[in-house]
Amino acid sequence: MPSHLDQTLAAALSERRAQYRYRQRKLLQSPQTPELVVDGKTYLAFCSNDYLGLANHPQVIAAQQQAAARWGAGSGASHLVAGHTQEHHALEEELAAFTGRQRALLFSTGYMANLGVISTLVGQGDGVFEDRLNHASLLDGGLLSGARFQRFLHSDINNLQARLRKTDAARKLVVVDGVFSMDGDCAPLPQLAQVCAQENAWLMVDDAHGFGVLGETGAGTCEHFGLDQQQVPVLMGTLGKALGSFGAFVAGSETLIETLINFARPYIYTTAMPPPVAAATRASLRLVQSEAWRRTHVQQLIAQFRNGAQDLGLQLMDSFSPVQPLLVGSEAKALAIAEALAHRGILIIAIRPPTVPVGSSRLRITLSAAHTEAQVAQLLDVLGEVMNSTAIRGLADD
């Protein structure tokens, strides 16, 4: 007989299934490339965050292998005990220089970085103001910080400013995604920076999906908009997306980084990333700076895809980033489209609530420098076939 624990949990799982929101993992049997082997079948994939195609780059792999031979497989300790190696330190210095900040600090994951920064900067008696479409890690960080937590309307400067003017919080932290992970649009960072300056608030940008891809050199959304450390004092970026590696960093002033080293619990109380991962990321960062053609190629593919989607009458969301969501509506329809694409050899994941708001389920299509124009053309052909099929057209949008 199932235990009380299992019975209780099974009821929640059954509800998820009934709502078409049940999630299952796919078993990959190949490296991250446009062609993935999943559960024994080969697909042309448009669902990876490997935006520059660096996860399987020979130089990145070689750097990790060589570092493993020198440093071993793991760091063995936290950064503050005995786990902070020369590889970690060099990567932090290189990230700081690349982003135009005084210092940078490595975190094991983006989720940990966001929780660590927000809980360090604000607490009881303070206020944290977040865009309604922020990543879950940012929202969780705000909720767990103990500060008064407010969500302003998506990219609505007036709504944010009104909230800032009403608060009596001692500290005010405004938090946004640089590129919103499920919508692909950019936050209006220049206007946000201006409002924060006017209202004596601090601006934090999570640039997980802009770092490496946007900006003249790939330094991200802050570079894209021409914003410096004074305008965006807290910058977070991840290393497992465009850089094809793993981990995250926070960049800012000397004082900010020293504060995080001393007060950010997710930094203090966890093992440092393996040194070979830091070495691989350093190789990726060099490629980001030396191979600008990758960003150019991605932008060309984005234009090709958006033009083709417009010709097909597909409802894409407003995005010039590699994240190109196709808005569908209902969970059932999104799943049906993803399944139909999979039957035709295209792997795209249906994104459903609670990740996105109810009624806005979508296919989160992502493009990479590793894709070819022919592969994007193939995607468009199959999308047109599926979206115009009788089976899909007959499904309700909500």
From Swiss-Prot:
SUPFAM superfamilies: PLP-dependent transferases (SSF53383)
Annotated positions binding pyridoxal 5'-phosphate: 110-111, 181, 209, 238
Xref: CDD domains: KBL_like
Keyword set, alphabetical order: Biotin biosynthesis, Pyridoxal phosphate, Transferase
Entry cofactors: pyridoxal 5'-phosphate
One annotated GO molecular function: 8-amino-7-oxononanoate synthase activity
Domain of life where this protein originates: Bacteria
Entries under Gene3D superfamilies matching the protein: Aspartate Aminotransferase, domain 1 (3.90.1150.10), Type I PLP-dependent aspartate aminotransferase-like (Major domain) (3.40.640.10)
Pfam families linked: Aminotran_1_2
Residue sites binding substrate per the record: 23, 135, 355
Catalyzed reactions per annotation: 6-carboxyhexanoyl-[ACP] + L-alanine + H(+) = (8S)-8-amino-7-oxononanoate + holo-[ACP] + CO2
GO biological process: one example: biotin biosynthetic process
Pathway of action: Cofactor biosynthesis; biotin biosynthesis
Chain positions found as N6-(pyridoxal phosphate)lysine: 241
Entry's EC annotation: 2.3.1.47
PANTHER family reported for this sequence: 8-AMINO-7-OXONONANOATE SYNTHASE (PTHR13693:SF100), CLASS II AMINOTRANSFERASE/8-AMINO-7-OXONONANOATE SYNTHASE (PTHR13693)
Protein family (similarity comment): Belongs to the class-II pyridoxal-phosphate-dependent aminotransferase family. BioF subfamily.
Functional summary from the UniProt entry: Catalyzes the decarboxylative condensation of pimeloyl-[acyl-carrier protein] and L-alanine to produce 8-amino-7-oxononanoate (AON), [acyl-carrier protein], and carbon dioxide.
Subunit structure: Homodimer.
Protein name: 8-amino-7-oxononanoate synthase
Source organism of the structure: Cellvibrio japonicus (strain Ueda107) (Pseudomonas fluorescens subsp. cellulosa)
